[in-house]
Structures are given as C-alpha cells and as structure tokens.
From Swiss-Prot:
Component of the NELF complex, which is at least composed of TH1/NELF-D and NELF-E. GO terms for biological process: negative regulation of transcription by RNA polymerase II; negative regulation of transcription elongation by RNA polymerase II; positive regulation of transcription by RNA polymerase II. This is Negative elongation factor E. Residues 25-36 have a biased composition (Basic residues). It comes from Drosophila virilis. The keyword Chaperone does not apply. Belongs to the RRM NELF-E family.
Length: 281
C-alpha cells in the first residue's frame, strides 16, 4: 500500500494562488452587482379628479380590473327580498292587453283596467285546474303503460250494417260481349237487362230476382269460362226493376182486358160513301 502525506503548512506558490482567487471572487461580485437592474421605489398613486364622467367611468373600470379598488356591491333592501315573480300567463295577458289598447280618449280607463285585471285573474284560475287535470291524465296513462294495462275499449254504438242485396251484378273480363254474358248467366235466372261498356271490357247483368244475382256471384266469381277469368260482384248502383211476371200485376191487367172488348162500345154514325169506276177514271 502507498501512503500520501500532505503537509499542514502551505507553500509560497499556494499562498499566491489563494490570494489571487480571493481577488477574482471580489471582482466577480462587483460585476454582478453592476449588471443587476436596480429596483425603483414604488411611487404612490395620486388620484386626480377627472373632468368628464366618461373618463371617470373608464378610470374606475381600470382600477377595478387591476384590483386597486373593490367593486361596490348593491345592498338588497327588504322590499327586494320579499318580492315575488309574476306568473308567465299573467305577463302574456298583460302584454296582449297593452298591445290591443287604442290611443284615444277613454273616460272610464280606471274602471276598464280593473275589469281587465279581474278577467286576467279569472283566466289564470281557470287554467290551473286544466293543467292539473292534464297532469293527472298523463300520470295515469304512464302508470297503466308501466303495468301493462293499456287496453283499448271500443264501444260500437252503431248497429251492424245489413248485407247488400240487389238484382244487378257487375261482370268484368277480357273481351266480354253481351252474347257471352247472356249465355253464361242464363242458367241462374231470368235476365231482365244487359248493359255493356265495351271499351272497358265489362258489363252489368240485371236479374228478375235478387236470389239469382247472389247465386251468380257465389258461383261465378273468379271462375274461368272459355279462357276468360270473370270478376263478378254486386253492382254499386242498383236500378229499380219492376217484376213483369208478377201474379198481382198479371191479374190486374187480365181483369182490365176482360172488361173492355177488343172493338169497343163506340158506334160509328158515319155513312159509307161509294164511288163509280167512271169517276175514278
């Protein structure tokens, strides 16, 4: 192992270096103190009274922003604390009445104002129960929906409509003719009339009895006859058809015919005039 021994006393060179270092240290401190900016003493703010009100307002605003002076807070009076907000409905009614007033001489304006205020108050009182009823209605509906009790009750006060009946049927098909309709529907009953709409390929067949029309609709609707699919329905407009072969009508006409002879009871009182052949020549 190697031991190094440092003497307690400094040599001359070390003393010179130490003195030099102390001088440099003092110079450095003096240079830093010279370069550092000097702090100027704060000057007291001298408030000058501005000549204009606008300038005073600007100065006060700047001072409040800088925090030099606090903002003045308005003290609430007892009347402000006990005041209440006017209802919206009353404000709306008051605005509408003020807009509708006419600038003219009104000798009874004070009484009219009292009446208007009374009407406004009565309207507000009427609106409150209506709002409560609406709220109750929506609340009950919501409860019923949550519980699953939404049931729509339909009360049919009207009587059930009677089934339609008639003698005339509506027939439509591709290239339908009058002869085709007579031939096809002749088996269901006596045909009174057949009317055609040739451009639209449809027609109307009138039977003597409604039963024949019902049977034709039941059997021929949607049926194909000679390659033509027929659409048979009851006609919307039913013409009034008087039955021809009715027993009562035939009896009436037979009695009238029996009472009257074919020649009649009138006697001809005229004399026959005869002409000769020479006169004709």
């Amino acid at each position: 192992m190697v031991y190094i021994h440092f003497p307690n006393n400094l040599t001359e060179e070390e003393h010179m270096l130490q003195a030099k270092y102390q001088k440099l240290k003092k110079k450095k401190k003096a240079l830093q103190a010279h370069k550092a900016p000097k702090q100027e003493p704060e000057s007291a703010l001298t408030l000058k009274r501005p000549t204009d009100a606008r300038d005073a307002r600007e100065v006060a605003r700047k001072l409040i922003k800088s925090g030099a002076i606090p903002a003045i807070q308005k003290q609430q009076t007892k009347q402000d604390q006990t005041s209440f907000k006017r209802p919206k409905g009353q404000e709306r009614a008051k605005r509408s009445t003020s807009e509708t007033t006419v600038a003219a001489y009104q000798p009874f304006s004070s009484t009219q104002n009292d009446v208007a205020q009374e009407t406004i108050i009565s309207e507000i009182i009427k609106e409150e129960p209506r709002r409560q009823n609406l709220y109750q209605h929506f609340a009950t509906e919501r409860v019923r929906e949550e519980r699953g009790l939404t049931e729509k009750v339909t009360l049919d006060t009207t009587q059930p409509e009677k089934p339609r009946a008639g003698n005339t049927i509506f027939v439509s098909g591709n290239k339908v003719t009058e002869e085709f309709l007579k031939k096809t529907f002749n088996d269901y009953g006596t045909i009174v009339n057949v009317s055609m709409e040739i451009e639209k390929s449809r027609g109307f067949v009138s039977f003597a009895k409604p039963e024949s029309a019902d049977r034709a609709i039941a059997e021929m609707h949607g049926k194909s006859v000679t390659g033509i699919v027929l659409q048979v329905q009851l006609a919307r407009r039913q013409p009034q058809i008087v039955p021809i072969n009715d027993a009562s009508s035939s009896a009436v006409w037979s009695s009238i015919a029996a009472s009257k002879s074919q020649k009649g009871s009138h006697k001809d009182l005229r004399q026959m005039v005869q002409y000769n052949d020479d006169f004709l020549m």
